[in-house]
UniProtKB/Swiss-Prot annotation:
InterPro entries: Ribosomal_uL22 (IPR001063), Ribosomal_uL22_bac/chlpt-type (IPR005727), Ribosomal_uL22_bac/org-type (IPR047867), Ribosomal_uL22_CS (IPR018260), Ribosomal_uL22_sf (IPR036394). Keywords: Ribonucleoprotein, Ribosomal protein, RNA-binding, rRNA-binding. PROSITE patterns: RIBOSOMAL_L22. Pfam families: Ribosomal_L22. It comes from the Bacteria. The gene is rplV. It comes from Synechococcus elongatus (strain ATCC 33912 / PCC 7942 / FACHB-805) (Anacystis nidulans R2). The keyword Ribosomal protein applies. Part of the 50S ribosomal subunit. Belongs to the universal ribosomal protein uL22 family. This is Large ribosomal subunit protein uL22.
Length: 117
């Protein structure tokens, strides 16, 4: 299945409070699939990360429809990746006056859609 990368449209969600590795687990399932297939998969996957990914996917398709005038039924996910965002640093009190650092990870989710040729 060939994809027209010249008309690629993307959407980005930044500072999502989730580990990038957990988001990548879902994105790896979506890459290369059609928009309709991806919607069905995201609806029934049992992962917490599906919700923000679904929002980004819908945003990318809305961008393609509004800005480029593309047909949503012809769109394929050409790129899908999650990059590391800044970590929120928290401390957990431990015995004898010590404290351990806890890093709450964030990520940036990017999804690009392109029409099928």
């Amino acid at each position: 299945m060939a994809v027209d990368t010249a008309n690629e449209v993307k959407a980005i969600a930044r500072y999502i409070r989730m580990s990038p590795s957990k988001v990548r687990r879902v994105l790896d399932q979506l890459r290369g699939r059609s928009y309709r297939e991806a919607l069905i998969l995201l609806e029934f996957m049992p992962y917490k990360s599906c919700e923000p990914i679904l929002k980004v996917l819908r945003s990318a398709v809305a961008n393609a429809e509004h800005n480029q005038g593309l047909d949503p039924t012809q769109l394929v996910i050409s790129q899908a990746y999650a990059d590391m965002g800044p970590s929120l640093k928290r401390f957990r009190p431990r015995a004898q006056g010590r404290a351990y650092q806890i890093r709450k990870q964030t990520c940036h989710i990017t999804i690009a859609v392109a029409p099928q040729v």
